[in-house]
Amino acid sequence: MTPREAEKIILADGWQLQEIQGSHHQYTHPTKPGEVTIPFHTKPKDLNRRTLNSILKQAGLK
């Protein structure tokens, strides 16, 4: 899964882009605690499986 595909999943769940620091996009949710960080420096390649799992856990989707 590419960073853009992961971003689509996060945005569909209601997360909103908070800020961009270099190649890392950070998202916050109006009701869920914490932040989700997606690294975009890997594009157009797929995200590492462990990185993807971490993103989904941060978002409360896994």
Outline where the language-model segments fall:
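C-terminal structural segments of small proteins and small subunits
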Residues: 4-8, 13, 28-62
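Positions that flank functional sites
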Residues: 25
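Short secondary-structure junctions
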Residues: 14-19
